[in-house]
UniProtKB/Swiss-Prot annotation:
Name of the molecule in the record: Non-structural protein NS-S
Alphabetical list of InterPro entries matching this protein: Bunya_NSs
Disulfide feature: none
Keywords, sorted A to Z: Eukaryotic host gene expression shutoff by virus, Eukaryotic host transcription shutoff by virus, Host gene expression shutoff by virus, Host-virus interaction, Inhibition of eukaryotic host transcription initiation by virus
Keyword Transcription recorded: no
GO BP field: positive regulation of protein phosphorylation; symbiont-mediated suppression of host gene expression; viral process
Family of this protein: Belongs to the orthobunyavirus NS-S protein family.
Domain of life: Viruses
Length: 92
């Protein structure tokens, strides 16, 4: 579990979907991150950045890069997902 003064985060696998559980002062939010079939490794926290009323949690799982942006005043969230290109060579 990752903890910030105003936000706690836990990652769970719910029905084959990696899900972030965000616990804020007055409520909790579930945020679906991706299918465990396409993201087989549990996402791990790379960094957290707090600035001007928002907290950004940067996670990775294999080629997946995820940024969860939490607007602290309103408790709303935004998920930005990037999948890095494969480095495998396919000889055709």
């Amino acid at each position: 579990m990752m903890s910030h003064q105003q936000v706690q985060m836990d990652l769970i696998l719910m029905q084959g979907i990696w899900t972030s559980v965000l616990k804020m002062q007055n409520h909790s939010t579930l945020l679906q991150l991706g299918s465990s079939s396409s993201m087989p490794q549990r996402p791990r926290l790379l960094s957290r950045v707090s600035q001007r009323g928002r907290l950004t949690l940067n996670l990775e799982s294999g080629r997946w890069r995820l940024s969860i942006i939490i607007f602290l005043e309103t408790g709303t969230t935004q998920l930005v997902t990037t999948i890095l290109p494969s480095t495998d060579y396919l000889g055709i």
